[in-house]
Swiss-Prot record:
Pfam families with a match to the protein in the record: Ter (PF05472)
Protein name: DNA replication terminus site-binding protein
GO BP term, pick one: DNA replication termination
Similarity field: Belongs to the Tus family.
Length: 310
């Protein structure tokens, strides 16, 4: 059970995040808007969080409307702030960018504010995921007991400032989470599950235990040097590719929230060129580079565990 002191830290850290976000919103509102472009994505309905998305239609908002939506989005932390038909398990995404004219001093002040907010968000995430000592299944209940309706992913998400970018382009990224494992590491994972028997619907406790035992035996029968990997697909994500002319470099950013471009004009760029995010269509994805697929055999579907050929 998490201590009273930890609960107090959880609440205090979150209140600081809220206050700092309010102050940042005001500071950003006081700046002159040079350009704004954000892309509204369809709402994810309840029980549809894990459904694969073949298409994602995009609705564009520009100018002052984009700025207003961006500022609201940064503080969208609770399910009470959204439609009751929208999933409470999927954080709202609003890719795009707002570009603001600032002096060098204002730029440094805003960068410091954003850095402080991101540090508070990291502290909040650590309190929930590490300091609480709770397993993932218990964290949700604990957090929502103290902060009812909180969308935890939105609370964790950091803000991304850009310093005098030249161009901002948007696109979609299809990715997999890949983790290489040894046979013995997988056996240890399965052993832990075997030592904590439970029912996992639709299976009874005994059926689940039997299933785990079969999985353990299948892995134990592999050679010790077998090459195993967890390869789990991640939902398609909006990304931004930002070009900095002064440094002659391109940086790719995840873009679940509007990027904050702070334009001081000190690097010869007055207003960056902001591109458009096109609708996503899984059947027409064009890959810049697609490496040759490795030969894999699926061993345990629920873990996305694969055996790589020698």
């Amino acid at each position: 059970m998490a201590s009273y002191d930890l609960v107090e830290r959880l609440n205090n850290t979150f209140r600081q995040i809220e206050l700092e976000l309010q102050a940042l919103q005001q500071a950003l509102s006081d700046c002159r808007l040079l350009a704004g472009r954000v892309f509204e994505l369809p709402a994810i309905g309840k029980d549809a969080e894990h459904d694969p998305l073949a298409t994602i239609p995009v609705v564009q908002h520009i100018g002052k409307t984009a700025l207003a939506r961006a500022l609201r989005h940064y503080s969208h932390l609770f399910i009470q702030q959204q439609s009751e038909n929208r999933s409470s398990k999927a954080a709202v995404r609003l890719p795009g960018a707002i570009c603001l004219q600032v002096t060098a001093a204002e730029q440094q002040d805003l960068l410091a504010r954003i850095q402080h907010i991101n540090a508070l968000k990291a502290t909040f995430e650590k309190i929930v995921t590490v300091d609480s000592g709770l397993p993932p299944t218990a964290r949700f209940e604990w957090v929502h007991r103290h902060l009812p309706g909180l969308i935890t992913l939105s609370a964790y998400r950091t803000l991304t400032p850009l310093v005098d970018p030249s161009t901002i382009r948007f696109g979609w990224a299809n990715k997999h989470v890949i983790k290489n494992l040894t046979r013995d590491q997988v056996l240890m994972m399965l052993e832990k599950s075997l030592q904590a028997p439970r029912a996992v619907p639709p299976w009874t406790r005994e059926q689940w235990q039997s299933k785990l035992e079969r999985e353990y035996q299948d892995i134990a029968a592999l050679p010790q040097r077998a090459r195993l990997k967890i390869k789990r697909p991640v939902k398609v994500q909006p990304i931004a590719r930002v070009w900095y002319a002064g440094e002659q470099k391109q940086v790719q950013y995840a873009c679940p929230s509007p990027l904050i471009a702070l334009m001081s004009g000190s690097r010869g760029v007055s207003v960056p060129d902001i591109g458009e995010l096109l609708n996503y269509d899984a059947d027409n994805v064009q890959y810049r580079y697609k490496p040759e697929a490795q030969s894999l055999r699926l061993l345990i579907p629920r873990l996305h565990l694969w055996l790589a050929s020698e």
